[in-house]
């Protein structure tokens, strides 16, 4: 017991702010017993001041491409509101941000990079704050968060933003230019060019995922998303966007404020989905109803060192634990999460049973069902508020959206929900996953009452 108390005393030293801080943390910090729960392999590190934590995570509503409420909204006008929200809701000085990394997929690289820089200016960031983009297909938003976490951990800066943006109205999926003839010599390279829907059919056929299983997954996604919307569960994560709708016939503009996802269909049933024809294969099972929606939207996540969050008195929404990106056969790219999730969970010193919630992107019902079954996951833990088949999948923004949805749900569930995972498949044959820990442990330290005596004893021992 004495060794444990001494070890905790050393850990607490990591949390003490610099001498320049005016807050008296000496009296507010005390050691208390920490257990790893059911996972003995997991080494509790959540008291370290150099943990990378998330203090805010927000997103726009997600709207149907070309037909939804963002059809007349510029991409930079989607990103700016969520960047601004991070600053306004935390009262952070924007000049303190070391970098803004934005995941984005479809737009030309140099153009989208300029749009993201412009959005930062709209949001109130000074010229001294750098901006860059990152593209790892559908995991780009999560990759942006992971890149920022890694940079903070490496000491490049203490505060950063990982974001995601996609306007599939503005930038539809299309290959520009000719294809290198050399691709014909490499089967796997050829498979990188397969339409995503064809890879979905490959997964369904190879692993025996039935049409009914896929349609049922879509029904469940819409049902859960509709229930979450009705219960107001998305209000904490969604930032309303003021924009416009343009009448295509008259050109008249109508100002609107978008505050809810517009692709959710509460009345979706197996019967209605069963009437839809396969899209990618004559006798296939992948339809418009059991695939993710083509969407417009953005999301942003504010990360910093835990010690900085404590100095600023900011509640911690979550702790970034690990990230993994893996490669799989491009012809069945949808299996990516089934490989990436175990890799990320293992890197965190955990087992799958330790994870309380999963946000797994529903690119296609076929691959979602396969990954769920392959890993033997409890359906009650996965996409509890619906997924991309109902909410939408704006490629570059999905990772940031999933992080926001996961962390706010973990916060609502409290101590019964400690670890969460975000994961998705990636076009051309990859998968990505990240592990997060619920972040309110720091609040207990920050809000702890002054301890006059027996400062190194746990509450149970006093």
UniProtKB/Swiss-Prot annotation:
Its EC number is 2.3.1.16. It catalyses: an acyl-CoA + acetyl-CoA = a 3-oxoacyl-CoA + CoA. The active site is at residues 138, 393, 425. The keyword Transmembrane helix does not apply. Disruption phenotype: Defects in peroxisomal fatty acid beta-oxidation affecting germination and seedling growth. Etiolated cotyledons, which exhibit glyoxysomes with abnormal morphology. Increased number of siliques with small size and reduced seed number caused by increased ovule abortion. Disulfide bonds join 138-192. Residues 1-34 form a transit peptide. Keywords: Acyltransferase, Disulfide bond, Fatty acid biosynthesis, Fatty acid metabolism, Glyoxysome, Lipid biosynthesis, Lipid metabolism, Oxylipin biosynthesis, Peroxisome, Transferase, Transit peptide. Pathway: Lipid metabolism; fatty acid metabolism. GO terms for molecular function: acetyl-CoA C-acyltransferase activity. It is found in: Peroxisome; Glyoxysome. Forms homodimers. This is 3-ketoacyl-CoA thiolase 2, peroxisomal. The gene is PED1.
């Amino acid at each position: 017991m004495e060794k444990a108390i001494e070890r905790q005393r050393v850990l607490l030293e990591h949390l003490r702010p610099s001498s320049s801080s005016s807050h008296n943390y000496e009296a507010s910090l005390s050691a208390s017993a920490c257990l790893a729960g059911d996972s003995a392999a997991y080494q509790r590190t959540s008291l370290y001041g150099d943990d990378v934590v998330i203090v805010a995570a927000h997103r726009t509503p997600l709207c149907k491409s070309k037909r939804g409420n963002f059809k007349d909204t510029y991409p930079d006008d989607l990103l700016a509101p969520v960047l601004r929200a991070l600053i306004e809701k935390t009262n952070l000085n924007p000049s303190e941000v070391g970098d803004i990394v934005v995941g984005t997929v479809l737009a030309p690289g140099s153009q989208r990079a300029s749009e993201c820089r412009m959005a930062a200016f709209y949001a109130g960031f000074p010229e001294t704050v750098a901006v860059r983009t990152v593209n790892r297909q559908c995991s780009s938003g999560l990759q942006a968060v992971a890149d920022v976490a890694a940079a903070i951990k490496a000491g490049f800066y203490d505060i950063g933003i990982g974001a995601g943006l996609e306007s599939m109205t503005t930038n539809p999926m299309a290959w520009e230019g000719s294809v290198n003839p050399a691709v014909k010599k490499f089967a796997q390279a050829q498979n990188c060019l397969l339409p995503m829907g064809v890879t979905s059919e490959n997964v369904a056929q190879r692993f025996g995922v039935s049409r009914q299983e896929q349609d049922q997954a879509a029904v469940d996604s819409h049902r859960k998303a509709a229930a979450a919307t009705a219960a107001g569960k998305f209000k904490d994560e969604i930032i309303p966007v003021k924009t416009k709708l343009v009448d295509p016939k008259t050109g008249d503009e109508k100002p609107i404020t978008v505050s809810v996802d517009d692709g959710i269909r509460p009345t979706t049933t197996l019967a209605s989905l069963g009437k839809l024809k396969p899209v990618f294969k004559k006798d296939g099972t992948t339809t418009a109803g059991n695939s993710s929606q083509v969407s417009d939207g953005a999301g942003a996540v504010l990360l910093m060192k835990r010690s900085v969050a404590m100095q600023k008195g900011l509640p911690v929404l979550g702790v970034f634990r690990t990230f993994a990106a893996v490669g799989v056969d491009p012809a069945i790219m949808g299996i990516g999460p089934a490989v990436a999730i175990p890799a990320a969970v293992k890197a965190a010193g955990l087992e799958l049973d330790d994870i309380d919630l999963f946000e797994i992107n529903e690119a296609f019902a076929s691959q979602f069902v396969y990954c769920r079954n392959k890993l033997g996951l409890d359906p009650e833990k996965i996409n509890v508020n619906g997924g991309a088949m109902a909410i939408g999948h704006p490629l570059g923004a999905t990772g940031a959206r999933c992080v926001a949805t996961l962390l706010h749900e973990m916060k609502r569930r409290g101590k019964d929900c400690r670890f969460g995972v975000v994961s998705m498949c990636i076009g051309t044959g990859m998968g990505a996953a990240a592990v997060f820990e619920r972040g309110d442990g720091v609040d207990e330290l920050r809000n702890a009452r002054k301890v006059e005596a027996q400062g190194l004893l746990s509450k149970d021992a006093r």
